């Protein structure tokens, strides 16, 4: 098994995840990916992370398929960057609730389960539940050194964020994908380059996404 240094940002999820409900009625989990550039190294990493979750779904026999749509140079990119910055700057000081402003219509208009922005800002990656409606907004930081020099770290961060949108919260197991917040550590990946899920997380996914 390959070993590497795995580092998670300080805030990966700014609130507790809520387990999905009635997902057996709709196995599709739609993710819209917005990138400014087709050459962004995070784009293939994001597709690999989605493939990881679909492979995990197949291995566990889940009624779940993550379906991606890639959009390059969207006309709403600036609005999404502004929203990402406003969330990141809070650093967890404000959790979604009655006082949380609605997400911009530029996000909700996509009508997807997840809008994932490959941000061009120096922010902390996060997965943010949309206030008063289903769905999540993910922003992935632009850290060119980490992304190019440590691709395993980058793809695990992206897979981690997508995991939150599937209902998985943080855990305190430093050898697992959903650990957070984690300090720098030496973790062991599988043969696909991803950290594993815990047994309890695998069982939770089987419960939430049980086949009919």
Where do the protein language model's features map onto the residues?
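Bacterial N-terminal signal peptides that target proteins for export
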Residues: 1-8
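Metalloprotease/metallohydrolase-associated module, dominated by Zn2+-dependent proteases
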Residues: 134-153, 169-212
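Bacterial N-terminal signal peptides
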Residues: 8-17
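Active-site recognition of the HExxH zinc-binding catalytic motif
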Residues: 156-170
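Fold-level signature of zinc-dependent metallopeptidase catalytic domains
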Residues: 25-55
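Metzincin-family zinc-dependent endopeptidase catalytic domain
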Residues: 43-159
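Structural recognition of the beta-strand scaffold that forms the well-ordered cores
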Residues: 31-34, 114-118, 138-141, 165, ...
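Sec/Tat signal peptide C-region and signal peptidase I cleavage site
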Residues: 18-23
